[in-house]
């Protein structure tokens, strides 16, 4: 794959992650992780929740005055279940925090980190050459910092790609926003 397309795809993927949102991707990835690993803690949490709800439902049906012993036993059971659920929730939150750190690191490496590496690795290689005389004395800026004169450097190409992708996003948002406004006005 050519350097030109590789850089464009890297910039596009980075912007796509930005558009979707890292937290949305984190939640999707964590849900998938829980399904694939079949986490025992998550299964226990679900079972404990349903057990607490069933016990609480029975507790609400029991009269505290007429059947005090049964009511007290159910109340202790609900309280114990809630305490166990709190402990389990803190364990799951700790696990999710660890997963979040790893996931965010992976996203950064796969988007921004790869762009830095590609920019550094190909810093002296031109992405493409410009026809002579098109930009006159400003052609050196397009080759900045290390590409040969008369060419476009990786850094400049990354900036141009990002600008085009962000502009494309704005155009799509404006077009969909106007069409949605039209639907709301006409109905």
UniProtKB/Swiss-Prot annotation:
The record's section on InterPro entries has: Get1, Get1_fungi, Helix_hairpin_bin_sf
Cytoplasmic topological domain ranges are: 24-107, 169-187
Pfam (any one): CHD5
Q: What domain of life? A: Eukaryota
GO CC term, one of those recorded: endoplasmic reticulum membrane
MF annotations from Gene Ontology: protein-membrane adaptor activity
Query: Signal sequence span per UniProt?
Result: none
- Membrane topology annotation: Multi-pass membrane protein
Q: Where are the transmembrane segments?
A: 4-23, 108-128, 152-168
Q: Which UniProt keywords apply?
A: Coiled coil, Endoplasmic reticulum, Membrane, Transmembrane, Transmembrane helix, Transport
Query: Main location per UniProt?
Result: endoplasmic reticulum
Cellular localization per UniProt: Endoplasmic reticulum membrane
Coiled-coil spans are 72-94
For this chain, the family text in UniProt reads: Belongs to the WRB/GET1 family.
Q: How does it assemble?
A: Interacts with GET3.
Q: Which HAMAP family does the record associate with it?
A: Get1 (MF_03113)
Its biological function?
Required for the post-translational delivery of tail-anchored (TA) proteins to the endoplasmic reticulum. Acts as a membrane receptor for soluble GET3, which recognizes and selectively binds the transmembrane domain of TA proteins in the cytosol.
Q: What is this protein called?
A: Protein GET1
**Organism whose genome encodes this protein:** Laccaria bicolor (strain S238N-H82 / ATCC MYA-4686)
The organism's lineage is: Eukaryota, Fungi, Dikarya, Basidiomycota, Agaricomycotina
